């Protein structure tokens, strides 16, 4: 397993956002995580990514995890290219990788991220998640603001990560988008995997 979570749960005060949950991701697979708004999908992904501590349970993850949260993962006052170069430096990735991703995603080089369209900001966040060649890619509603061509591109990237031996977990409301892509589906309802 590339990623394993055992008994992870999360409470915010007295509110239970995520019941004790077990999740594992194997290399070579794309897994869809579906459920309604407020089901706990974003909470689970944040725990798996390591940006939110579980109230209980344990997560074993590889060193390189790429994560696209629902909320922006970039700095609005920097340009797309500056964001990519900053995160490349933090991840000890050659700056040429940042330049390649900016070109691959057709991101405007001189426009502040805060001035980009919602779709371009989403593409920037996907590019940031790919900087360090992640072994696990966690995507939280990554295509909600993308046009069909860009949406298809993100799904192609997800499949490429899996085909190279990585694992991908995609949270979405629209499981039909992932029918041809996902190897299996997990459903989360009221903080419980069903």
PLM-predicted stretches and their roles:
Residues 3, 18-20:
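Conserved structural motif at the start of ABC-family nucleotide-binding domains
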Residues 34-36:
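The feature captures the beta-strand-to-loop junction immediately N-terminal to the Walker
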Residues 49:
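Helix-to-loop junction immediately C-terminal to a conserved catalytic motif
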Residues 148-150:
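Helix N-cap at the start of a conserved alpha-helix in ABC-type nucleotide-binding domains
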Residues 137-141:
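Catalytic Walker B motif of ABC-type/P-loop ATPase nucleotide-binding domains
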Residues 166-171:
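Conserved H-loop
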């Amino acid at each position: 397993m590339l990623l394993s979570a055992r008994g992870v749960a999360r409470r915010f005060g007295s509110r239970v956002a995520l019941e004790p949950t077990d999740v594992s991701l194997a290399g070579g697979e794309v897994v869809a995580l579906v459920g309604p708004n407020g089901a706990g999908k974003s909470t689970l992904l944040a725990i798996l990514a390591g940006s939110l501590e579980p109230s209980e349970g344990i997560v074993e993850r590889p060193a390189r995890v790429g994560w696209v949260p629902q909320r922006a993962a970039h700095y609005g006052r920097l340009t797309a290219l500056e964001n990519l170069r900053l995160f490349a430096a933090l991840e000890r990735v050659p700056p040429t990788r940042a330049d390649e991703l900016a070109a691959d995603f057709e991101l405007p080089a001189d426009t502040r991220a805060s001035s980009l369209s919602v779709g371009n900001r989403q593409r920037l966040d996907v590019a940031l998640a790919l900087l360090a060649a992640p072994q696990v890619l966690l995507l939280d509603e990554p295509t909600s603001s993308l046009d069909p061509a860009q949406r298809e591109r993100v799904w192609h990237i997800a499949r490429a990560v899996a085909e190279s031996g990585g694992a991908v977990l995609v949270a979405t409301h629209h499981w039909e988008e992932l029918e041809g892509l996902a190897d299996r589906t997990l459903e989360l309802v009221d903080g419980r995997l069903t």
